[in-house]
Every structure is written in C-alpha cells, then in structure tokens.
Design a protein with these regions (language model features):
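Short loop/beta submotifs within extracellular cysteine-rich repeat domains
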Residues: 75-76, 134-138, 256, 314-318
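DNA polymerase processivity clamps
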Residues: 42-72, 224-254, 298-303
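C-terminal functional regions that serve as terminal interaction/effector modules
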Residues: 1-33, 243-256, 261-263, 267-346
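Hydrophobic, ordered structural segments
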Residues: 1-5, 15-17, 94, 101-202, ...
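N-terminal, charged amphipathic alpha-helical interaction modules
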Residues: 16-41, 181-226
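Long, positively charged binding patches that form subdomain-scale interaction surfaces
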Residues: 200-271, 275-276
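An N-terminus-focused feature that recognizes amino-terminal "leader" regions
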Residues: 1-122, 346
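Short, low-complexity cationic-aromatic patches
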Residues: 59-61, 100-105, 117-125, 240, ...
Length: 346
C-alpha cells in the first residue's frame, strides 16, 4: 500500500496554499495519488460512489451531452457527446456511439467520485474514476447543456456508505518494458502473417511470452518499421492537411477512448502538440515520445496499418489507424501517408 504521509486535512490545507496546478500535477508534487487528493474532499463537494462500470455508465447516460476524458502520462483525449449503447462485460465493456467510443476494463475501475467544484464562472461537475493505485482511468465532465439536476440527484442516491476522506491505495505497478522471447521470433513472424483480426495480436504475443513493443522490435520488417519520433508531428500535419479520416486511440490499463474522423486544427504549444477541433481535443507531449512504429497486421478486410507511439518506459501513448468502414475506407490514403514517414536513423 502507498505510504500516506498526509491526512486529508493536510492535503486540503496544502491545496488551499497552491490552488492553480491541475489535480494530477499537484498530487504528484505532494507524492500522493490523484484519487487521494479527490478523496480528501469527501463531504466537501466530493461524493464517493460505486466504481463498477455498470453503475458509472448507467449514471453517465442520464447526464446528456458531456465531455469524456481518457488519458495516460503523455496524452489526453477529450470527446464531447452523449453516453449511450453500453455493452457490459466481465473482462471488457464498451460504449459505442458515433462520438463517444470506449473500451472499458472493469477490474481496473476501483474508486469513483462525483465532484463539484467552484469554477471561475460556475460550479464544475464531474464523475471521476480511478484504479487501485489512485491513477485516473476515466473522467466525465458536465457542460452547460448537461443535465445538472440529474447530477445533483446522483450525489444523493448514489453515495456509498463510506464517505471518509481518508483512503488507502495500492502501490503503482511499474510499466512493463519491451519483452522478447528470442527463441520464438520465427514463430511470431509466421503466426503474425496468419492473423485475420487485429484483436488476435495481443493474444498471440502473450502466448509467446512477449508484449506489444517487444513483438514489434523482434519482428522487424516488413511487419513493423521503426520510425523517427519526429514522424509523429509529420503524421498529424499530413493528416490535417489531407483531411484523411483516422481512428485515434488513447488509453490506459482501465479505459481506451477512440476518435474517428479527420483532424482539422493543430495548435502546437511548447512541448505539446494539440488537436483543437469542435467535439474533439487531443493534447500530446511530443517530448515524451521515445519510440514510434509503423505496423502492418493482416485482417479479413485487408491489411490494417497503424502508427503507434511509446514513451521511454515502453508504455503505449497512442495508436492511429485508417478508418476501415465500408463507404468510408481511408486505409489506402492513410497507408500512403505512413509510407512517407521518416524511419529512425540507422
């Protein structure tokens, strides 16, 4: 368990002294989890609720149009839309709408809170979910047109029995570095070539005692081509200028959020590359991109080409694919853009 050196009162006092940083940054500066910071305000604008996706998604569907946020250490993915079409599952669940498209892993949803905070102009309301270590898994932010009455009712009807501001969190598991089984590389290449669906890939590499990044390094050309980290900017710029539609995945071990469509407005700022489109924002720390791969996987509908970025620890930052939908197939255009991206210097 994490060493909780600060009481909830200590955390609130420190926060009052330093109100400007975002929750994640402030919690990191204090050496606590983000969920510990949120929990410290239970009874003071924060209500602890059941974190199971079945509960959270049922509530989310009553809120109307909201902003969905899923992030990892290097990338933030924000989509505006309505939660609907929820598909429950013990291992994996989904929200499938045109605007909000989520892959949910219920075992990671361990702590959840309804949060009300005074903002510059109005009270900001959100539903925030965290994993066992207190790291954010998924957040839902109400907008002006959201159903604020439904949210207020949730604070009364969904409140857990335990509303203590003190909470315990597990130690954060380290990121798994690239894992390669040298004696199984030939098997990897042969089995990879026989794939018929991209979802079979992780089962294959797990069976061979490897992981995603390890498999890319092991397989090499023509299945996986390492690109320069600078290729990420080139990719986004070319997608924006060409209007090519993509599926852009950003996630963590508890939730993956997907945007499908074109990228219209890029606004770089310092180390950040930002997509600032109506209904979709992306915030990417370019300086934390350490390794980039262009990957081909065979499927029944043709080759699925992706560009995938990793940080220095080996954690996946994002994936980009062409859109494979009938009548809206952008894969050839996407593949042409990827083929022109700069490879990593030899």
């Amino acid at each position: 368990m994490q060493n909780q050196t600060f009481t909830a009162a200590d955390i609130r006092a420190r926060r009052a002294e330093t109100p400007r940083p975002r929750d994640r940054d402030f919690a990191e500066s204090l050496g606590i989890s983000e969920a510990a910071l949120v929990a410290a305000y239970c009874g003071k604008g924060v209500t602890r609720i059941d974190a199971h996706p079945d509960v959270v998604m049922e509530a989310a569907q009553d809120l109307g149009e909201v902003m969905a946020l899923t992030r990892n250490a290097s990338c933030v993915h924000e989509k505006v839309g309505v939660y609907d079409n929820y598909h429950p599952g013990n291992h994996a669940a989904m929200i499938l709408t045109e605007d909000i498209d989520l892959r949910i892993f219920p075992s990671r949803w361990q702590h959840a809170f309804l949060v009300e905070r005074d903002g510059d102009a109005a009270t900001q309301c959100s539903l925030q979910v965290f994993d066992a270590a207190g790291d954010a898994v998924h957040k839902i932010f109400l907008r002006d047109g959201s159903d604020h009455k439904a949210f207020a009712q949730m604070t009364r009807t969904m409140a857990s029995d335990n509303q203590s501001p003190e909470a315990q969190f597990a130690d954060r598991a380290p990121v798994e570095a690239a894992k390669i089984a040298e004696d199984k590389i030939d098997i990897l290449r042969k089995e990879w070539a026989r794939l018929t669906d991209t979802h079979q890939f992780l089962r294959l590499v797990s069976k061979l005692k490897m992981n995603r990044l390890g498999a890319y390094r092991a397989a090499g050309l023509p299945l996986a081509r390492q690109l320069s980290p600078d290729a990420v900017d080139a990719l986004l710029i070319n997608l924006q200028s060409s209007g090519t539609e993509v599926m852009l995945f950003v996630g963590n071990h508890g939730c993956i959020q997907i945007h499908t469509g074109a990228l219209h407005t890029l606004k770089p700022m310092g180390p950040w590359q930002n997509v600032m489109d109506p209904g979709f924002n992306l915030h990417l720390r370019r300086d934390e991109v350490a390794e980039v791969w262009a990957v081909d996987k065979p499927t029944q509908r043709g080759t699925a080409t992706s560009v995938e970025a990793f940080d220095a620890r080996g954690a996946l930052i994002f994936q980009v694919f062409g859109v494979p939908k009938e009548g809206r197939d952008s894969r050839p255009a996407f593949r042409a853009i990827v083929e022109d991206l700069q490879e990593v210097p030899a």
